[in-house]
Amino acid sequence: MTTKKLYFLSISIIILVAISIAIYITLNSNTKTRLTNDSQQQIDTIIEHDLQKGHIPGASILIVKNGKVFLNKGYGYQDVDKKVKASPTTKYEIASNTKAFTGLAILKLAQEGRLNLNDDVSKHVPHFKMNYNGQNETITIKQLLAQTSGIPSDITSEDSVTNKNNRLNDVTRAIMGDELHHKPGEEFEYSNMNYDLLGLIIQNVTKQSYTKYITNSWLKPLHMTHTSFKQNNNKSKHDAIGYELQGSTPVVSKPEFNLWDTPSAYMMTSTEDLEHWIKFQLNPPDKYKSLVQQSHKNLSSTIGEPNANAYASGWFTNNDEHLVFHSGTLDNFSSFILLNPKQNYGIVVLANLNSEYVPKLVEHLNTQIVNHKRYSTVASMLNQYKDQFNIVTVLMTTLILLAFIFSAYRAWQMRHGKIILRKSKLTTFLSWLTLCLCIAIALILYALPYLILGSNNWSFVLTWLPIEIKLTLTTAFIALFSMLITLLLILHTTTIKKP
């Protein structure tokens, strides 16, 4: 590579990096940031930032810590057209977070001796059978709980199954004799049908409908009096309207659904009701303590699942961080429930849009809770030095202007033949050294939040930094790379001496 090409490559890379960083900081800036020692304001800022980024119309968020409600609040709208604001009483479809109720109900029936987790499913669902390599296979209740039955995740994707069968009995008959993906008990594969079958077992054992049993045995005792199960697409006063994105605009969505999928996906509830569920999960009464602990116990390894080591009874678990959690997604709703029994807190996010920002928001809130004292210290320190940061911003802006003037002058000189590019091994070496320095600085900057605060990223940090500090960071990054460009110009150009 010639010195001239290397020179222009160096300049191009540095400019691109500087522009990218500046754009990234600008896009993640929020002039409404309110960083004080009040955790409520910090958390509001984080929530509003993520909801805005995800174009989420409305959400209700609950944080319970040490048995007390730290936050239970609605953001945005449960109904955009009617301007009905989301609140703690807004009901959302919580999708797969229904599974934890189904799993706990099965464990309770086992504790009562009404079934055994090692029972063959066909003992309670006589017509049920599945094949593996053409041979009939025994599937146990425990394997359904653990998602290791081998039942394919897409087994009910065929229209002939989903549209013509709207009862649990009918759909299990429709798939009877189908081929399993794996031999039961050998491999984890997430499938709603596992928990739909558990719902059918609950019905057959209790001689009640699944919804009636869950309501009478769990929801009412937990005072979850406004929780229900979806029956149709009609909406009542407190029900959130579901939305799907068209571009970046949320539009009302009423997708078809299947009643037989209720034990896996169609509980409707609010953060007001889930407050009781979270408190029960974190601090259960003595008579339920062993049952709740059992429901959090690992049943199968979940290799390949993000952030999860194992699957329990309707929960994913992360043993490294002592987390119990589950996401829930439908075409027009999403939810996420996270528990940390060891540190005694829980987080719930319910939204009326299927958005990847729901789990991101939970991650950010979890980080905020775990590192609250550290953030408060950093926040307090930064606010004390706002004036100094403003001075640094002015100085950095001055450096940028000087670097721009120098670069423009050098470009004018080169165009008029007053300077030429140096060609030597030394300048080539210095060019590569400059590039390596640039990369090293970029890596250090990327890792800075982790080095200072631990296990964070810039996207999260920028949600709560004051605007003064964001401006300082932006100008500092641009000034740094401007000076690198200036250095390259000095190294690679020399004035033509007049004869």
Swiss-Prot record:
Assigned keywords, A-Z: Cell membrane, Membrane, Transmembrane, Transmembrane helix
Topology versus the membrane: Multi-pass membrane protein
GO cellular component annotations of the record: plasma membrane
Pfam families: Beta-lactamase
Record's keyword annotation contains Glycosyltransferase: no
Signal sequence residues: none
UniProt xrefs under SUPFAM superfamilies: beta-lactamase/transpeptidase-like
Function of the molecule: Its precise function is unknown. Has no penicillin-binding activity and is not involved in methicillin resistance.
Anything else known: Has two of three conserved motifs typically found in penicillin-binding proteins (PBPs) and beta-lactamases, but no penicillin-binding activity has been detected.
Protein name, per record: Protein flp
